[in-house]
């Protein structure tokens, strides 16, 4: 109840009003965040019987598409923090099948992932997975799971386990969290 009142107030803030009216915010990442939050808040409002809030939020989760360009990557004209459009393009979203369709389907999505992780074009390091030391990249390997390529996911996680997390190979060791400087 107190939380729902805070949600109602937040819906009237300028940035959220802008999001409701235009479907986009200054940064593509923030647009994606707000779309995901909108879906969660809609569910919460309905669970607590606040149809009025649910109606204000209804459909805003669809604005996630506005964070992406036609090539299936996040918008090139956006600013990014601790990364670039590649680093943020493989975050999980609620509408994962539609997300993959932006890339031409699962095959196109996997092709972008393969490039990002260096399975193809190993010489091109301009748009590359930076590792588990960068929080913007930590979710990215799991995009392979959504695309049905658990083999690739396991390969990345196995490699990370051996090279990053095990003290015997120079990693941080058991319980280590590389790059967690926040």
Report each predicted region and the residues it spans.
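Active-site core of glycosidic bond-cleaving carbohydrate-active enzymes
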Residues: 2-62, 66-182
């Amino acid at each position: 109840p107190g939380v729902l009142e805070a949600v109602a107030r937040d819906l009237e803030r300028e940035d959220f009003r802008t999001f409701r009216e235009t479907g986009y915010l200054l940064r593509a990442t923030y647009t994606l965040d707000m779309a995901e939050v909108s879906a969660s808040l809609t569910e919460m409002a309905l669970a607590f019987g606040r149809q009025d809030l649910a109606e204000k939020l209804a459909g805003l989760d669809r604005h996630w598409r506005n964070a992406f360009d036609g090539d299936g990557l996040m918008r090139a004209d956006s600013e990014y923090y601790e990364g670039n459009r590649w680093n943020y393009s493989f975050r999980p979203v609620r509408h994962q099948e539609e997300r993959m369709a932006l890339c031409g389907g699962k095959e196109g999505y996997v092709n972008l992932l393969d490039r990002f992780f260096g399975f193809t074009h190993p010489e091109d390091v301009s748009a590359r997975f930076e590792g588990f030391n960068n929080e913007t990249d930590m979710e990215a390997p799991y995009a392979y799971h959504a695309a049905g390529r658990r083999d690739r996911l396991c390969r990345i996680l196995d490699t990370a386990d051996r090279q990053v997390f095990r003290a015997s190979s120079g990693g941080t060791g058991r319980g280590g969290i590389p790059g967690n400087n926040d």
